[in-house]
């Protein structure tokens, strides 16, 4: 029988170490975060710690914990429910699936919303098929136009 997969096994130590360093630098900010992490599953707490360990200070100061919790919960859910996601190298998963920021866009809770909007449409598809279907869905729903120096968040583009 195959050994059960451990979420972020290769990067767990690095994440914990970097999170503790951030917490040491910003103790008043991280005290309430630590309290909220205690209410999370081990996997979601580790995903949140990754986000907090590597996000810019501006994100730590400008957005509430619940925004990052949404990203963490959805990342863990994808990892648990989709073997293709779980098979990704951890660095790819951390930087391109879990992480909350692409550019300079506003950070918004959007993954739960988009999962509800498109999840059933791509269920059971392989990565290639799902990527194409998401692109078709995006073309049906929104056309992106850069309006200023900042990039709009995905949810802002969708709601236009």
Residue ranges and their predicted role:
Residues 90-159:
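Secondary-structure boundary elements
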Residues 1-120:
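Linear, non-domain "peripheral" regions
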């Amino acid at each position: 029988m195959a050994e059960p997969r451990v979420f972020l096994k290769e990067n767990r130590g690095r994440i914990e170490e970097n999170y503790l360093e951030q917490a040491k630098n910003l103790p008043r900010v991280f005290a309430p975060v630590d309290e909220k992490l205690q209410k999370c599953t081990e996997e979601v707490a580790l995903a949140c710690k990754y986000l907090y360990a590597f996000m810019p200070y501006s994100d730590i100061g400008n957005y509430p914990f619940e925004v990052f919790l949404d990203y963490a919960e959805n990342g863990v859910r994808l990892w648990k429910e989709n073997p293709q996601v779980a098979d990704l190298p951890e660095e790819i998963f951390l930087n391109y699936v879990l992480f909350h920021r692409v550019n300079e866009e506003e950070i918004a809770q959007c993954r739960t919303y988009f999962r509800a909007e498109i999840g059933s449409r791509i269920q059971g598809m392989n990565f290639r098929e799902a990527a194409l279907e998401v692109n078709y869905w995006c073309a049906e729903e929104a056309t992106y136009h850069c309006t200023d120096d900042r990039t709009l968040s995905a949810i802002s583009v969708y709601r236009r």
